[in-house]
């Protein structure tokens, strides 16, 4: 996450040049594939099914083999979270800029979980557990396993960077400051686990500052006096936060551009299928490269035709 933030902020001066290599069809494919992947993988925690798998096809196969037997408490926590995430920003637009709906949803379901299960005992409903020290603040020696984990982290960071870059540069009104803010937020998230990144760029500095101050106070409370209680947050609620956030990040307008011609349809389908059928990090990188080549060739052809 920190690596993706550094890359995103570093790209700010080159925003206009990079925009030429962003394919709307590839953006649609990547965003839709990301939302579908998050939905399939996190449904396991939402319904407390107990499935196993690291990629979409493995998780779907696990659902088929084990059967779809949701736990009522998981459904309850997740559904309450979804209702808050969807209705709170619509009913309280100004307040939602400072107090994130995700924070309210997690607090509400935490209190409900403490009421239904006051004393911790192993159940089908998983809880997030104690929040450990941020990894960037640890200085353990890097061995062979650590090097492999570092390489994997860099690949995932690059994939996340491409997702964020496509998400932001896909909008014509995106400014350089949006990339800088997005990068800084990602760096803060890696340093302060539990911080919430807005799914859409925040344009108003006052709202951003208020949200940061509120988030800092809440994080301090979670880390110090309320740590034993914050560990009881149901993973079902966290799963729904990820699912809703993923679908809110989808640029639905780009889907129309994806069907503008047979070539864009092929590019959209390739981006979608590659990301769904492989590891999401590898799929994102491969799809982004294909999209950049297509967009670059198209841009060069347009320039040659304009010069002629």
Region spans (language model):
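Membrane-embedded alpha-helical modules
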Residues: 1-111, 115, 213-307
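Hydrophobic transmembrane alpha-helices of secondary-active transporters
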Residues: 31-39, 130-143, 155-164, 238-251
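Peri-membrane helix termini and adjoining interfacial loops of integral membrane proteins
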Residues: 47-59, 120-135
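Juxtamembrane interface elements at the cytosolic ends of transmembrane helices
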Residues: 79-92, 124, 157-171
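Selective recognition of specific alpha-helical transmembrane segments in multi-pass small-molecule
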Residues: 102-121, 157, 187, 191
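Non-transmembrane accessory domains of multi-pass membrane transporters/channels
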Residues: 134-150, 296-308
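Membrane-embedded helical hairpins/re-entrant loop segments and their flanking transmembrane helices
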Residues: 141-210
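Cytosolic juxtamembrane regulatory segments of multi-pass membrane proteins
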Residues: 183-188, 255, 307-308
């Amino acid at each position: 996450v920190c690596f993706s933030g550094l890359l995103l902020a570093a790209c700010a001066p080159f925003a206009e040049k990079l925009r030429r290599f962003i394919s709307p069809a590839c953006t649609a494919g990547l965003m839709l594939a990301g939302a579908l992947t998050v939905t399939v993988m996190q449904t396991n925690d939402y319904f407390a099914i107990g499935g196993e798998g690291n990629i979409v096809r493995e998780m779907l196969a696990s659902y088929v083999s084990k059967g779809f037997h949701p736990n009522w408490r998981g459904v309850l926590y997740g559904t309450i979270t979804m209702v808050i995430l969807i209705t709170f920003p619509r009913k309280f637009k100004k307040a939602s800029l400072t107090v994130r709906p995700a924070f309210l949803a997690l607090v509400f379901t935490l209190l409900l979980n403490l009421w239904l299960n006051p004393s911790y005992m192993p159940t089908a409903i998983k809880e997030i557990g104690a929040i450990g020290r941020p990894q960037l603040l640890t200085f353990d020696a890097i061995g062979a396993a650590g090097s492999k984990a570092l390489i994997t982290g860099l690949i995932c960071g690059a994939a996340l960077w491409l997702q964020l870059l496509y998400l932001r540069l896909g909008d014509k009104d995106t400014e350089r400051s949006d990339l800088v803010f997005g990068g800084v937020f990602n760096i803060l998230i890696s340093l302060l686990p539990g911080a919430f990144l807005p799914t859409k760029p925040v344009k108003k500095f006052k709202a951003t500052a208020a949200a940061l101050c509120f988030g800092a106070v809440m994080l301090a409370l979670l880390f110090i006096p309320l740590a034993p209680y914050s560990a009881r947050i149901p993973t079902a609620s966290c799963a729904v936060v990820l699912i809703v956030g993923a679908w809110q990040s989808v640029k639905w307008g780009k889907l129309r551009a994806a069907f503008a011609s047979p070539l864009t349809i092929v590019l959209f389908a390739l981006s979608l299928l590659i990301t769904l059928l492989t590891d999401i990090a590898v799929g994102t990188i491969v799809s982004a490269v294909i999209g950049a080549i297509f967009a670059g060739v198209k841009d060069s052809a347009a320039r040659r035709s304009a010069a002629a």
